[in-house]
């Protein structure tokens, strides 16, 4: 009987996002005869309707261990405040002191708990889901354990020289979700032999949602052109640029019948709603909040917009392409890898609101362009980004000894 690898999957995230969905798609399909996986999270976070990640994992036969995170203690807060006062003359010194305090109260205890779980569970591999900067305690635990460590880098990483040194010393392999993410790793000094790319992917055979049904639910007429975006309402997603561009579009085409549907939740929601009011487009913008089935909402769109400052390889772009919805995206890592400008979608330089507005205009006014972009993108996603390729690619890395 072949050796079954016993894997502890560490995810330090606090909310349900695209990386969570990609992880779940892998776990649903991974070969259980070869890989015995237990998840270790810092929070049993939930989706909008209350279903927790633990419940979803239990439904597919994957156990979950939660390491509860305590609030920052008073002594740590006071130490940081004292450090800021005493080290007022040096920003770098203040940052270093703050980090030292965080290591004492947060990182070291987590390292100890991960190390204990790993030993008690008899695991042979620590597999981490996100990026090195948010998985640092995993690297430190693996160093103590001298364990095999696989990093799945799902977004464009933020790397510092000390972090790169840690990665180079202790990582066995780093899986990048796009060639762009791998390029960023290499540019920051991560050893080339550690890096490999396994493209994010989607299930191209999944049932497709009913476009008309969701439009009726949102009270959107058939003749209304729907722009839309899906994702956390956070600064990195740059939805404020999208609203600015839509205001320009609306001024240029006051006769246009359109809506903008923002699917997602986050700290920017109130500011975005106020921005829409200030721009005079509040009646055109629909905030749905977080949704368990964003794919159903995506089907209502006539054009999908992703204006992010950075991405890994956004699954939602692949899903839009599968639904024959043309994509307008910022020219950043990940997104630009999926879109060949004017062939499989439209690109604009990040933060270039005028060019984004022009792209909105082009998609809205030119039905032939819309159809051509959507058809080419559909062919590309079916040929290159099928979920089977993603699963086999990750299995090959996890199974290599």
Label each PLM-derived region with a short phrase:
Residues 290, 309:
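Aromatic "clamp/platform" in nucleotide-sugar-dependent glycosyltransferases that forms part
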Residues 143-144, 149-179:
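A conserved, positively charged/aromatic
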Residues 180, 201:
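Carbohydrate-associated surface elements
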Residues 326-329, 339:
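Short hydrophobic beta-strand element within catalytic cores of glycosyltransferases
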Residues 55, 207-220, 277, 393-396:
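A short helix/loop element that forms part of the nucleotide-sugar donor recognition site in Leloir-type
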Residues 61-64, 273-289:
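Nucleotide-activated donor-binding/catalytic signature segment of Leloir-type glycosyltransferases, i.e.
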Residues 17-25, 225, 229-251, 256, ...:
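A conserved mid-protein helix/loop that constitutes part of the nucleotide-sugar donor-binding site
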Residues 340-342, 346-353, 362-367:
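Conserved acidic donor-binding segment of nucleotide-sugar-dependent glycosyltransferases
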